[in-house]
Swiss-Prot record:
Disulfide bonds join C3-C17, C10-C21, C16-C30. This is U6-ctenitoxin-Pr1a. The presence of a 'disulfide through disulfide knot' structurally defines this protein as a knottin. Pfam families: Toxin_29. It comes from the Eukaryota. The keyword Transferase does not apply. Its main location: secreted. GO terms for cellular component: extracellular region. InterPro entries: Toxin_29 (IPR012634). It is found in: Secreted.
Length: 32
């Protein structure tokens, strides 16, 4: 599965390259 970088939208399983997935105003995004 692909992973997302910080500031990008999380994948369906919430996988981030680093950091974690949070619920942001514009949807679920990865943060460090």
């Amino acid at each position: 599965a692909f992973c997302r970088f910080n500031g990008q939208q999380c994948t369906s399983d919430g996988q981030c390259c680093n950091g974690r997935c949070i619920n942001a105003f514009q949807g679920r995004i990865c943060i460090g």
